[in-house]
């Protein structure tokens, strides 16, 4: 369901399937850059329940308004966020320590911010989701990508 307007547009993204594809793309388990993942999805594709899926194109998104437009036009986007030692319960809490980076799906938005889905399961945030306020946007993402 599209969390912006309640329509039936499918916003479910299997981040684990994309990450797991790197086994054939890279010989080591040091993570994967967005550019490598998107290149793989465009040229090799990712197996889904509905068959092999390939993206046609991808591009970076750099602003709140551009991200909103990309979600409406293309569906979920992917973004890289810093990971703090408080990240299992909340994105960031005062006094938290930086531990690394992580990819998430940005699946929708409302008047207060973006709805984020993580691949860590239902124990993370609020049943696997969290809400990122617009005022925290510029200090949150390393990069954001949209794809068609």
Please provide the spans of the model-predicted regions.
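Catalytic-core signature of thiol
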Residues: 1-148
């Amino acid at each position: 369901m599209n969390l912006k307007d309640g329509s039936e547009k499918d916003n479910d993204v299997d981040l684990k399937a994309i990450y797991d594809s790197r086994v054939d793309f890279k010989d080591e388990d040091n993570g994967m850059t967005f550019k490598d993942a998107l290149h793989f999805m465009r040229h090799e594709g990712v197996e889904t329940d509905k068959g092999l899926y390939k993206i046609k194109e991808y591009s970076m998104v750099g602003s709140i308004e551009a991200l909103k437009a990309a979600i409406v036009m293309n569906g979920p986007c992917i973004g890289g966020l810093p990971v703090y030692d408080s990240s299992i319960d909340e994105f960031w809490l005062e006094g938290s320590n930086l531990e690394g980076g992580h990819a998430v799906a940005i699946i929708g938005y409302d008047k207060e911010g973006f709805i984020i889905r993580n691949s860590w399961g239902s124990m993370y945030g609020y049943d696997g989701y969290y809400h990122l306020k617009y005022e925290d946007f510029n200090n949150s993402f390393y990069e954001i990508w949209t794809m068609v």
